[in-house]
Regions:
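Active-site beta-loop-alpha substructure in enzyme catalytic cores
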Residues: 1-9, 24, 31
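Metal-dependent phosphoester-hydrolase catalytic domains
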Residues: 12-23, 30-139
Length: 139
């Protein structure tokens, strides 16, 4: 799995990573078990494997899931959350805001005049996370 390689060669190289300021984010094209209350897919569904690895083998915290427990936050034009922001507990303590931006501009709209898979402004919604790094310096 690509995510295993990525994690082992980045955060996996830092013995005290949970106490350091690490972040990993992106379009992972996979689902999180933390959202399975919404998806209701079988426990052995392969779409959960990538995020399972991150949650089980790294100190990373899923920022959106932690900030909005019990509230599904779709990040695409359909009801899926495949974009993730992870950070270590030390950095999570600095989070002041975390949200998937949903407004008239960020609402994905298919544009049939262009390519069949073209969405305006994007097929993904932006995720905003604000960190107050002054809090990290005090620790």
């Amino acid at each position: 799995m690509e995510i295993e390689y990525i994690c082992r060669h980045t955060i996996g190289t830092a013995p005290r990573a949970a106490e350091e300021l690490w972040v990993m984010l992106g379009d992972n094209n996979s689902w999180s078990r933390l959202d399975n209350w919404f998806y209701k897919c079988p426990e052995d569904d392969p779409r959960l494997l990538t995020q399972d690895y991150v949650l089980e083998h790294t100190p990373y915290v899923d920022v959106i899931a932690r900030q909005h427990p019990g509230r599904f936050q779709t990040t695409t034009h359909s009801e899926k959350r495949i974009d993730f922001v992870y950070c270590t507990p030390a950095l999570y303590d600095c989070v002041t805001r975390a949200e998937v931006v949903r407004d008239d501009y960020t609402e994905p709209v298919r544009d049939p005049k262009k390519l069949s898979n073209f969405w305006h402004p994007s097929d993904h919604r932006p995720i905003v996370v604000d960190f107050d790094l002054k809090k990290a310096r005090k620790q």
